[in-house]
From Swiss-Prot:
Residue span, Rhodanese domain: 404-482
EC number: 2.8.1.4
PANTHER family, A to Z: TRNA SULFURTRANSFERASE
Family annotation (InterPro entries): Rhodanese-like_dom, Rhodanese-like_dom_sf, Rossmann-like_a/b/a_fold, ThiI_AANH, ThiI_fer, ThiI_N, THII_Thiazole_biosynth_dom, THUMP_dom
Record's subcellular location: Cytoplasm
Short name of any one Pfam family annotated for the protein: Rhodanese
Gene3D superfamilies: 3.30.2130.30, HUPs (3.40.50.620), Rhodanese-like domain (3.40.250.10)
Protein name, as recorded: tRNA sulfurtransferase
Keywords: ATP-binding, Cytoplasm, Disulfide bond, Nucleotide-binding, Redox-active center, RNA-binding, Thiamine biosynthesis, Transferase, tRNA-binding
An example Gene Ontology CC term for this record: cytosol
The organism of origin for this protein: Photobacterium profundum (strain SS9)
Amino acid sequence: MKFIVKPHPEIFCKSDSVRKRFIKILDSNIRIMVKRVSESVAVYNRRYHIEVTANDDSDRDQILAILMQTPGIHHTLEVKQTEFKDLHDIFEQTLELVGEQLEGKTFCVRAKRRGQHDFTSIELERYVGGGLNQAVESASVKLKNPDITVRIEVDYDHLHQVLHRHKGLGGFPLGTQEDVLSLISGGFDSGVSSYLHIKRGSKVHYCFFNLGGPAHEIGVKQVSHFLWKKYGSSAKVKFISIDFEPVVAEILEKVDNGQMGVVLKRMFMRAAGQVAERYGIQALVTGEALGQVSSQTLTNLRMIDNVTDSLILRPLINWDKEDIIDIARNIGTEEFAKTMPEFCGVISKNPTIKAVKAKLEKEEANFDFAILDRVIEEARVMDIRDIEKQSQEQAPEIELVDQIGDGAIVLDIRSPDEEDESPLVIDGVEVKHLPFYKLATQFGDLDQDKEYLLYCDRGVMSRLQALYLTENGYGNIKVYRP
C-alpha cells in the first residue's frame, strides 16, 4: 500500500530554501501522526512530494484520514507501484488494472514522468490511451470531461498507477506560521476561525473565558480537543481556562447597561493579550463577523482592539452565518456548536452600536481591575493532550422539571434588568430573585431544607448554575423549564 502526497501548490511559489523547509516540516508532521497508527509505516521526503508506505492494508483508512486532514497537502494519490520494461509494458499493466472499468465509458489518460526515459509524458499518454481505445471496443476517448481519467506516473524505474485521488486540506504545513491564541467559546464561529488558522499553518492555542461553570468548560474542552486531534495533532498546544464569572459580576454591578457588551469584550482582550504575551504568542484569533451582534460594528471593534498591543485576527469578518455553519458541518464541529450554551444573563438590554472611548473609560473607571488581574493570575493551563485523559470526568446530570412540587421555591436567576422587564409570577408558588452572578456567594444563605428550581429565559444559565451548585455539594437543586 502506497500513498503519494502532493504538497499545496502555494508552497512551490516560495524560494528553494523556504520550499525545502515547508516540505521538511510537512514530512515531520506526517511522520509524527502515522507512527501512531503503526511503527511499520514508512515516510519518505522526495523533494517535490512525500511517499507514505505501509505493509498492512488494515491501516489504510486510518492513514488516509490523517493525510486528508493534514494542513499543507493539496491531494493524495493512492497508487499501485510496479516496475516496467517499456511503453508497451506500461500499457499492458494499465489495461489489466482499468480495462473493465472503461467498458461503455469515455476516458482520457493523464501521465506524469520523472527521470530519464526514451519517451515523453505526451507520448506516454498517447501510447497508453491509444492502446486502451483499441483494446476496449465499447470505450471512447474524450479529452475534456471524460467519465474516467486514467492517471499514471512514471517515477524513474517505477510505474505508479493511480487507484484513487483524494482531495487534501490545502493551506500550509502546521508550524510554518507563528502561533496564535484562539478565544474559543465552543460555538460555530470560534471553532471555524480556529480551524482556518490551523489550515493556514499556525499552531492554535486555546483560551476559554468561563462564564458558566464546569459544564461549559467540559464542552469547550471537547471541541478544542476535537479540532486539535483531527487537524493539528502533530503540534503541542495549550488549553487555557480563565474563570471570568467574577469579572462578569463586577461588570453587571458597576457598568452602565448599554456599555456592558463592549466592556466585557475589552476585558476579554486585555486578559487574552496578557496570556499571549506570557507565552510569546503573536496574535489573537476571534470568530467575530461584522455586524453579527451589536458589539461587532466597526466602531465597537476598534474600541475593543484598543486595549491590547496584540494583533487581533478575525478570519470570519466578512462571512455570512450560513457559510460559517456550512464549514462547521464540513469540519465536524457543528454538533458541538449546536449544543453549546448561549448565556441569557450577560446581554445588554439596549447595547450600544457606536461606543465612545471617553464613555467606555468612564464606565471602566468604576471597575475593580484587581479582579481582572486575579483571574488572569489564576488561569489554569493544561496540555491539550491531557483533555482526553479527563474524558471520563462528566458533569453531573441535573433534573429538568416542568411541574413544581409542594414546598419548592422557584429561584429566578436572571439579571435585575431582565427580571424587571418580565417578572416571573406563578400562582401559589414562592418565587425568589437571586441573580446568577450572586449564586456562588449567596445561595448558601438560603434555607437549605427547601428544594430550589432555578429559572432563566433560555434554560441554559440555570442548568449551568445548577451544575456548579451541585458540584459544590448542594443536593436540593433542579431546573425549572415550564
